[in-house]
């Protein structure tokens, strides 16, 4: 029997290029719940994101693809300015990207820019959002429009409009395969903006994870989720202050009840020896608990104790 021809292995140089991207990707945790994510259909996945249950990790090829999208933004700004539009990529008052925040700084995002002088409506300021698409995704976008084809992108723009008070958004999409452009003007919908803000509030301040979108681990949204192994399997959550039952989001940061102190982002990433998992993150049933331990009966019937009763170490 003839064997299928195996692909050539990557060259050392190619492997090194991808490895350099992977080395620079950080720890996979975002300090806030992002406006770019709030349109996700699974609220449990968003809660896991916010609680740093699973670090987001990507291959070098995917990270390079993300960078391509970022590099495209400068070209799209140039294209808009060629039409005589005024495009601001940074806030003149701060010299930084325009940024919106809500819920004590736990929710927010950064705008790609704002624009005025557009040919369709020269006097109205617009939130500007740039996105790159595969050929298949681009065709669906052109056929259905952003609200139906890319609800997560639409939600992101609604949040930006709602929190800036700008009444229009300009969605500029480029097909990575053909360089074709698609442009839509999107009106602000205050009701949708408020609903999305409330969704973010529920996720941020929820003590327990919301229901998963599907109990079927093979459901398409579940199969490609960063949290699949934790939500549907036996994977352990990452050990950070955010996965600890002692921590709570408060105005402007996080508070640890065990040590009665505020936690900066570096603290949150380090955790401490008194860390105890939020029980919802453990695949088992609580059988006993105390100040510094929680005992479980795991799904396979075995006992396990999340024990922090060792000699006190430095506060987290």
Regions found by a protein language model. Give the residues of each.
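Metal-dependent nuclease catalytic regions and adjoining charged, substrate-binding loops involved
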Residues: 140, 144-154, 159-255, 260, ...
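Internal, hydrophobic cores of structured domains that mediate oligomerization or house catalytic pockets
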Residues: 123-127, 131, 152, 161
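Metal-dependent nuclease catalytic cores that hydrolyze phosphodiester bonds in DNA/RNA
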Residues: 1-127, 134-136, 147
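A short mid-domain helix/strand-loop element embedded in enzyme catalytic domains
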Residues: 130-134, 175-176
């Amino acid at each position: 029997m003839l064997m299928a021809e195996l692909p050539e292995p990557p060259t050392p140089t190619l492997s090194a290029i991808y490895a350099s991207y992977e080395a620079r990707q950080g720890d996979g945790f975002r300090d806030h719940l992002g406006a770019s994510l709030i349109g996700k259909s699974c609220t449990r996945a968003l809660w896991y994101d916010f609680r740093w249950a699973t670090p987001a990790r990507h291959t070098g090829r995917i990270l390079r693809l993300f960078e391509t999208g970022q590099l495209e933004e400068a070209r799209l700004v140039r294209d808009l300015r060629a039409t005589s539009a005024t495009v601001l990529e940074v806030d003149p008052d701060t010299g930084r990207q325009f940024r919106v925040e809500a819920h004590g700084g736990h929710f927010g995002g950064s705008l790609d820019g704002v624009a005025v002088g557009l040919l369709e409506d020269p006097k109205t300021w617009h939130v500007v959002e740039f996105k790159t698409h595969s050929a298949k995704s681009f065709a669906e976008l052109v056929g259905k429009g952003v609200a139906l084809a890319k609800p997560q992108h639409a939600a992101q723009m609604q949040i930006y409009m709602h929190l800036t008070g700008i009444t229009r958004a300009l969605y500029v999409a480029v097909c990575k395969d053909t360089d074709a452009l698609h442009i839509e003007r999107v009106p602000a919908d205050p009701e949708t903006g408020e609903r999305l803000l409330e969704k973010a509030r529920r996720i941020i301040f929820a003590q327990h994870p919301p229901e998963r979108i599907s109990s079927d681990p093979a459901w398409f949204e579940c199969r490609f989720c960063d949290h699949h192994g934790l939500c549907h399997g036996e994977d352990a959550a990452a050990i950070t202050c955010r996965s600890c039952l002692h921590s709570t989001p408060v105005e402007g940061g996080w508070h640890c009840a065990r040590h009665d102190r505020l936690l900066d982002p570096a603290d949150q990433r380090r955790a401490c020896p008194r860390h105890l998992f939020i029980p919802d993150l453990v695949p088992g049933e609580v059988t006993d608990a105390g100040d510094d331990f929680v005992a479980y009966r795991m799904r396979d019937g075995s006992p396990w104790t999340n024990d922090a009763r060792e000699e006190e170490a430095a506060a987290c």
